[in-house]
Amino acid sequence: MNIQEAKETIEKALRAYFARDEIGFPLVPLRQQRPILLIGPPGIGKTAIMEQIAEECGVGLVAYTMTHHTRQSAMGLPEICTRGIEGKMVHTTEYTMSEIIASIYDCMEQTGKKRGILFLDEINCVSETLAPVMLQLLQDKKFGNQHIPDDWLIVAAGNPPEYNKSVREFDVATLDRVRKIEVLPELSVWLSYAEKNQIHSAVTTYLMAHSDHFYSVSHEADEKRFVTARGWEDLSAVLKSYEILHFPVDEALIGQYLQEEKTAEEFSSYYRIYAVSYTHLRAHETTLHLV
């Protein structure tokens, strides 16, 4: 499905999981509230839709990129405790609260929102020591012996293996406990987003004429070449700022965002023509206004 369909699917899951019957019990029992696993190429807007959903549904959002974390930050730090077992005092290992779970409680306290989304990006690219912790989260909704609070939807995201050599495949036991959604880039959906978010018209008109340049990822030898939706959006922002500041826009700048040589070259040529036409149009409008 495309990113808009994925957003709508997650919104429905959120509302279904949080809904209660007339007695106050969840319509979907807690143990059957499966985490959602988004699998899709990088830069198509997975993180962006989570922010939109949280804002539109009025819930909290705690987001983490899991490749930046260790087993200790996810599970908490071990500490030695003393407890009585069968009349004897023994030392046991317990864990401090997970940094991630603590962040959920911080979010609830700071925003006053008791319901929310825990979004964990790059979940299938974590280190070998952290991988079992992530599997436990998806299977049991907990880190170590600490459960994710009720009324918090777990959404995890990752890239398919063809986009990232670090990807770890999930086993059937894990996939059987999640709602897996495969997301693909779709230009028409992105153009609707672009219109609402005032993406530079040079970008949108170019992509309308060159739809095959919207998204691509390839590997040649040790070189990665790619163009993503994120790249186009960020390029749009820098084009606007350069125009205001009267800075020149060249192929080198464009290539920093569109990291595929042919696309960068062709858009650079298109933008030069666009810039000249736009300048002439503005000059003509100014002349008419003065008359």
What are these regions, as identified by a protein language model?
Residues 13, 17, 78-81, 197-198, ...:
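Alpha-helix boundary/capping residues
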Residues 132, 229-233, 261, 265:
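Non-catalytic, well-ordered alpha-helical scaffold segments
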Residues 158, 227, 283:
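Single, functionally critical "micro-switch" positions that shape active/binding sites
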Residues 198-254:
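Conserved AAA+ ATPase small/helical "lid" subdomain
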Residues 247-278:
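Charge-dense polyanion-binding interfaces
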Residues 2-205:
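AAA+ P-loop NTPase catalytic core and its hallmark functional loops
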Residues 279-286:
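Conserved small/polar residues in nucleotide/adenosyl-binding loops
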Residues 290:
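Cytosolic catalytic cores of cyclic-nucleotide second-messenger enzymes
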